[in-house]
């Protein structure tokens, strides 16, 4: 694209070379330049926590006790970062959307949700938001007239968005992806969506323009734990947790090296002769053969003295495992997890049922808070889809809606049957409805 500066971009699936194209305006080129620069800056921040969630991080070797030659050949990892994300993804599940005054899920919105297979896609958005601060939802026209709008979950690694001064509405957005190995770009503005692909000559050409003139960019940000100074959200993999994980991995590396060097007890031999270390042919035995076999019996010397064999204290792995357990306990406090979640099992004093329930309650409360934050983004997504169905206009009945979430806790059938039966008997719940069945 003429004038498009992409020299600093490093993306895993697509590069954007500065090649001529007569189909883009100067404004579009300037917009793409700004979005690409923003993507380059944000990508490093997003990956800094994502690599820990995937257990692909590189641990810095302090080079004090372990040389680089050993550290480069060994890799030690713990899966604690995933525990900061996965338990909440398991607790977040959308069952549908309700309009004011309705007790059952709205069927029009359910058709939109099911038609885009979002029951399966929603967990992708929750995982990205919890691990990388945010996820994106995009809305577009259907493949042909009369089709449902397309609703997609997009990784923040493949999106760049600029926002208004309040930080709640997108001004423009850029998305990149590959189809059959061919790079594609989607540029979203207030008036249109421009789809570009790289041709066989390496030049970018416009594949399609969807001129909707809706006055909004069909992109919604689902931010995790946003702040007034960080509307883009914060990862559940916090700097404190990352520090503990790095320290634990270094201790595991030390344990691995020490087990190789000191698992066989070291010995000291006094008074042995050279012949004790030779085979029947007079050749010197290897150190391993000598250590394993020859020290089982040593002959007296010519003066009748027996060589002395001393053994140093055997290596104790508890030197490292106790430290690792201490790090696991610290991580459990940050994660609101019971020790068993981090692999700590104490047979003599196991976690009590009350302690377990307290941790589960804390996680459930946190999941409910995330339902409120993520639910606001999901409502905006469904409202955008309704705009696409109604020529950019949002019907009055869809201006207010609520998300129906599956309860984060999973009580047994016996625990729920009694209170629901009493509510039905009191007339607080209808005997047959989606709400009653859900409970």
Model-found features: residue ranges?
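Extended, charged amphipathic alpha-helical segments
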Residues: 207-359, 406, 412-413
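Extended amphipathic alpha-helical segments with heptad-repeat/coiled-coil character used for oligomerization
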Residues: 389-420
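Short coil/turn segments at secondary-structure boundaries
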Residues: 124-126, 140-142, 259-268, 341-347, ...
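C-terminal structural cap/anchor segments
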Residues: 330, 334-399
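Extended, helix-rich architectural segments
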Residues: 1-153, 158
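Extended, regular secondary-structure scaffolds
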Residues: 130-131, 136-239
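Charged substrate- and nucleic-acid-binding regions of tRNA-handling and nucleotidyl-transfer enzymes
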Residues: 414-439
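Generic structural marker for isolated residues within well-ordered, non-membrane alpha-helices
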Residues: 109, 328, 382, 433-437
């Amino acid at each position: 694209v003429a004038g498009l500066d992409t020299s600093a971009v490093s993306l895993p699936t697509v590069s954007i070379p500065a090649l001529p194209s007569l189909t883009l305006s100067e404004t579009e080129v300037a917009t793409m330049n700004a979005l690409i620069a923003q993507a380059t800056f944000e990508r490093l921040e997003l990956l800094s926590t994502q690599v820990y969630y995937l257990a692909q991080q590189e641990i810095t070797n302090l080079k004090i006790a372990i040389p680089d030659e050993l550290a480069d050949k060994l890799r030690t990892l713990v899966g604690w970062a995933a525990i900061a994300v996965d338990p909440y993804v398991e607790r977040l599940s959308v069952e549908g959307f309700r309009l004011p005054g309705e007790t059952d899920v709205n069927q029009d919105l359910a058709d939109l949700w099911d038609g885009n297979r979002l029951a399966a896609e929603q967990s992708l958005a929750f995982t990205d938001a919890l691990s990388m601060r945010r996820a994106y939802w995009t809305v577009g026209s259907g493949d042909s007239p009369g089709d449902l709008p397309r609703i997609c979950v997009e990784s923040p690694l493949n999106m760049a968005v600029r926002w208004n001064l309040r930080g709640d509405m997108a001004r423009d957005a850029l998305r990149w992806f590959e189809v059959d190995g061919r790079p594609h770009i989607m540029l979203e503005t207030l008036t249109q969506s421009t789809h570009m692909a790289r041709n066989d000559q390496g030049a970018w050409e416009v594949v399609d323009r969807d001129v909707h003139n809706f006055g909004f960019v069909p992109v919604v940000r689902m931010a995790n734990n946003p702040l007034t100074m960080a509307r883009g959200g914060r990862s559940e993999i916090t700097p404190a947790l990352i520090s503990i994980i790095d320290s634990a991995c270094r201790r595991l590396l030390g344990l691995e090296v020490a087990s190789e060097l000191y698992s066989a007890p070291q010995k000291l031999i006094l008074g042995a002769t050279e012949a004790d270390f030779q085979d029947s042919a007079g050749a010197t035995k290897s150190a391993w053969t000598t250590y394993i076999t020859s020290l089982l019996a040593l002959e007296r010397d010519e003066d009748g003295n027996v060589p002395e064999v001393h053994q140093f204290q055997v290596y104790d792995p508890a030197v490292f495992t106790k430290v690792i357990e201490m790090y696991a306990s610290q991580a459990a406090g940050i994660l609101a997890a019971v020790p068993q979640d981090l692999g700590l099992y104490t047979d003599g004093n196991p976690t009590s049922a009350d302690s377990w329930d307290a941790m589960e309650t804390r996680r459930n409360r946190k999941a409910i808070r995330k339902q409120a934050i993520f639910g606001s983004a999901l409502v905006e997504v469904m409202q955008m889809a309704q705009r696409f169905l109604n020529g950019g206009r949002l019907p009055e009945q869809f201006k207010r809606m609520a998300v129906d979430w599956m309860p984060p806790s999973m009580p047994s059938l016996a625990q729920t049957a009694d209170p629901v039966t009493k509510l039905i008997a009191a007339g607080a719940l209808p005997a047959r409805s989606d709400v009653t069945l859900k409970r």
